[in-house]
Regions:
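Structured catalytic core of nucleotide-sugar glycosyltransferases
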Residues: 1-133
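Short conserved micro-motifs on helix faces and helix-strand junctions that flank
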Residues: 16, 74-76, 164, 237, ...
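Acceptor/aglycone-binding surface of glycosyltransferases and processive sugar-polymer synthases
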Residues: 70-76, 80-90, 104-187, 203-222
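A generic fold-level signal
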Residues: 6-8, 39, 91, 158, ...
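Hydrophobic helical membrane-anchoring modules
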Residues: 2-10, 183-323
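A ubiquitous structural signal for well-ordered alpha-helices
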Residues: 27-30, 34, 58, 113, ...
Length: 323
């Protein structure tokens, strides 16, 4: 392969955590079991995304001199995708894995992904065969992935989240992306290189509650739409064109009715319907444009992506923010 793999690679893991005090003890046990099975060194970076429970205290108690664990703690909650993005900026290793703390994605699958990476793939992402969430969330996720794949200007694999391993050069390229609202799975696809999927059974949460509610999923979907497609803007233009044709047709109908047949078009009721229809179309178009303008506004402010309040373990205390 063009990209030569090191003989003794190291694996770095990025694990975003937000109010995961219930799941963390199980996660730490699973990570220890994976470390015993692995024939490569593993370093784990836990990113505390401004948790309000005992997440940070549990992590701090698990870190000791010589530990392969480290942690960075945000000054507030910046969001799951930003937590992964920050982890990519601080993690070390020849190959980098991303996994959530809830153990829905089995850590032992990471070792199979690393084997695929050894074969020459630069990105190995997990493909979920099934999900154990409730019907509403399963339907929402399914719709999100299919809609994103259908309108994005790049190929984003179906049913693949952030669970993956990436070659170091892929991570370095993602770190250069300036987006303040990054969608990691989208950026991972955008960089290209050799990518492949690995199917696995997605489990139920080991403990605690899911942090991705339906409103958060909708926000993630909007983020994906405006980040990787201009189709909504094109649809708005076509909608405007269609409504203009409808308006022109109504005008012709009114003229023909009055001049040719001596019939006066219906009064205030039809006028109210027409006004409401066109007003609704205008508001929809303004909303779409506003969503894109809002993203541009966030980018031009150029605020830091995140702020690190403190760090523990092997992670360097430098680079406390990313602008």
């Amino acid at each position: 392969m063009a990209n030569t793999r090191p003989e003794n690679p190291s694996l770095g893991l990025v694990i975003p955590c937000y109010n995961e005090e219930a799941a963390l003890p199980h996660l730490l046990v699973s990570l220890e079991a994976v470390q015993k099975k692995a024939n490569i060194p593993i370093r784990v970076l836990l990113v505390d995304d401004g948790s309000q429970d005992r997440t940070y205290e549990i992590i701090a108690a698990a870190i000791h001199p010589g530990s392969n664990l480290a942690c960075i703690r945000f000054s507030r909650n910046f969001g799951h995708q930003i937590a992964v993005f920050a982890g990519l900026h601080h993690v070390v290793g020849d190959v980098i894995g991303v996994i959530d703390a809830d153990l829905q994605d089995p850590p032992e699958v990471l070792l199979k992904m690393v084997n695929k990476w050894r074969e020459g793939f630069d990105v190995v992402y997990g493909v979920r065969r099934n999900r154990k969430e409730n019907l509403l969330l399963r339907s929402g996720y399914s719709l999100f992935y299919r809609m994103l794949q259908g309108i994005a200007n790049i190929e984003i694999p179906l049913d693949s989240g952030d669970f993956c391993v990436m070659d170091r050069r892929v991570v370095e390229l993602i770190k250069q992306m300036p987006e303040h609202t990054p969608l990691i799975r989208g950026l991972r696809s955008w960089v290209g290189f050799r990518q492949t999927g690995l199917e696995y059974e997605r489990a139920a949460r080991v403990d605690g509650e899911s942090k991705y509610s339906l409103p958060r999923l909708v926000n993630l979907a909007v983020q994906g739409l405006v980040s990787f497609s201009a189709l909504p803007l094109r649809l708005a233009a076509w909608l405007g064109f269609f409504t203009s044709i409808v308006g022109f047709a109504l005008m012709i109908w009114a003229i023909v009715s009055a001049v040719g047949f001596g019939k006066t078009p219906p009064g205030w009721a039809s006028l109210a319907v027409i006004v409401l229809f066109f007003s609704g179309v205008q508001l929809i178009v303004l909303g779409i444009i506003g969503e894109y303008l809002g993203r541009v506004f966030e980018e031009v402010k150029n605020r830091p992506h995140f702020i690190v309040e403190s760090s523990l373990g092997w992670v360097a205390p430098a680079d406390q923010s990313r602008s």
